[in-house]
Amino acid sequence: MDLIGKNVVIYGAGISGVSAYELVRDKGGRAIIYDDDPTAERATNSVGVFQNADVIVLSPGVSLCKDFLFDAKLENKLVISELELASACTRATEIAITGTNGKTTTTRLIDAILKAAGKSSRALGNIGTAFSSIADKLDENDFAVIEASSFQLEGCLNFAPHIAVLLNVTPDHLERHGTMQKYMDAKAKIFAKQTEDDFLVYNADDDKIEGMIIGARSHKVPFSIVHPTNGGYISSGFVCFKGKPILPLDEVDFKGRELENVVAAVCVAMLLNVSPYIIAKAVADFKPDAYRRQLIGSIDGIAVFNDSKATNVYSCLSACEAMDGDFVLIMGGARREEDFDDFFRQVPITLKHVVVTGENQNDIMSCAFDRDFKSIESASSLKEALGLALAYARENKCKNLLFSPSSKSFDAYKNYIERGKTFDREVANCKNFERSK
């Protein structure tokens, strides 16, 4: 992308916005940051800056639906996302991962495997490090492993990663996108501009994805945790790729739907000719980020898991399916358009009791009763919910307690991390708590 002499407005003064600003300056453009917040550092809040803009770069938190952005498009101004800008300024081989759930884990898995294989790899994007902060410093020998959210993808025009990974698509962020179709359209931009020289690794168990990818021009590489495919799959206790066993399941710390992340990562690694031995060792050594079904310790012999990252129904369901033995669940949070009826229709029989708390607790209880799930009670706080869950587990000899909210955190917390830390503190304050080593 030629930015020399161009007037570029960066919309958003956060991490990705500031990184985009620096990238534009490095590429010879005239950059200015705009932010709705008049107190934002290094930014103006005067909308007049958009009048003279040649290019408008949107941070992930900025929706395309703003009226003056629509007007900008009518005036033939280029309106793009930070991801599009970074991609246009890099020579690295791009591997992009999207999906409603599992993006961060899969991104980190692929990055870990490539590093284990001696390749120069960077995990970037929605995972925390803005792609634009390093895009122009990477060359053709580097791999940019990019976690791409729907927010980042919706502003892409020509983004075409060499390998795109589509993990799953379930309802999420509809308050931003408006409809499920628009959400899916944003996700589809991860492969829309790929060519016959590129690869699309996709979840063959997801019916919505099967419909989305019909027109994809890239090589389609399916994966499944249910049945064999001509890509990645699970068979006889192994993750396999095109008929070849790659790694034994008993050596990895993933279960249930979590295995989708592993199989997808194996597909990418095999497409890049990484040896099965290196893949197996890297996956066996891998530790997921905090608050993803994380064992934090035990109380009176009851194992306590913190899955605060579960911000939607399907991520919670994935955690439930991965639990060994009977368990009690604490769930609930901010009220959004979540289908809890679907949750109680699919929960494993090992789920013995649910304690709900948060803004949407009445919605959850109503769906539970409609599905004839009667072992459920409500709590006015996370502390009370923990006490009720422990009491049930002790009385009924359940050996596991899972905190997996299935909801956004914004009813009471800044984000899922703050919520996870709060749960950690409540657990640590319990009598007879023993921290996991």
State what each model feature region is.
Residues 1-81, 85, 430:
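N-terminal leader/targeting and accessory segments in enzymes
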Residues 4-7, 19-23, 248-351:
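Nucleotide phosphate-binding/pyrophosphate-handling subdomain across enzymes
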Residues 24, 56, 97, 126, ...:
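Residue-level signal for inorganic ion chemistry
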Residues 32-35, 200-204, 330-331, 350-359:
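Short internal beta-strands
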Residues 35-38, 80-84, 218-234, 280-284, ...:
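Beta-strand->loop->alpha-helix junctions that form or flank phosphate-binding loops
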Residues 82-125:
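Walker A (P-loop) phosphate-binding motif
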Residues 138-222, 233-235, 246-254, 409-417:
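Flexible active-site lid/hinge loop adjacent to a nucleotide/diphosphate
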Residues 341-399:
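C-terminal helical cap/extension that packs against the catalytic core
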